[in-house]
């Protein structure tokens, strides 16, 4: 029974593959592709710029700078304490 189902499916798939791409799926000419590259790059640049500006605004409005400042202060304090301990230990 499986062979009776597998053979027609195989024939249909093989026919579809050998038929090739439909005219609407055919690859466009390379010259038209090259002509569209500057427009695509400009669109990509604009999209990237908009997303970067939105991300920067989100960071500015969030509390990340305050947390970063606290973390930096903690590291500075810990480093200076460690430095003093090493100075007293090896003096």
From Swiss-Prot:
Subcellular location: Secreted
One biological process term in Gene Ontology: negative regulation of cholesterol transport
Listed GO CC annotations: high-density lipoprotein particle; very-low-density lipoprotein particle
Gene3D superfamilies in alphabetical order: Apolipoprotein C-I (4.10.260.30)
Database matches in InterPro entries: ApoC-1_sf, ApoC-I
Protein keywords: Lipid transport, Secreted, Signal, Transport, VLDL
Family matches, as Pfam families: ApoC-I
Family: Belongs to the apolipoprotein C1 family.
Protein name per Swiss-Prot or TrEMBL: Apolipoprotein C-I
Signal sequence, renumbered to the chain: 1-26
One function term, GO molecular function aspect: fatty acid binding
Function recorded in the entry: Inhibitor of lipoprotein binding to the low density lipoprotein (LDL) receptor, LDL receptor-related protein, and very low density lipoprotein (VLDL) receptor. Associates with high density lipoproteins (HDL) and the triacylglycerol-rich lipoproteins in the plasma and makes up about 10% of the protein of the VLDL and 2% of that of HDL. Appears to interfere directly with fatty acid uptake and is also the major plasma inhibitor of cholesteryl ester transfer protein (CETP). Binds free fatty acids and reduces their intracellular esterification.
């Amino acid at each position: 029974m499986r062979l009776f189902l597998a053979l027609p499916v195989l024939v249909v798939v093989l026919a579809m593959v050998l038929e090739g791409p439909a005219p609407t799926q055919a690859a466009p000419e390379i010259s038209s592709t090259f002509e569209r590259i500057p427009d695509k790059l400009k669109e990509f640049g604009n999209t990237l710029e908009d997303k970067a500006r939105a991300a920067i605004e989100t960071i500015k409005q969030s509390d990340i700078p305050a947390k970063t400042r606290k973390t930096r202060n903690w590291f500075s304090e810990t480093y200076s304490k460690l430095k003093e301990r090493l100075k007293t230990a090896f003096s």
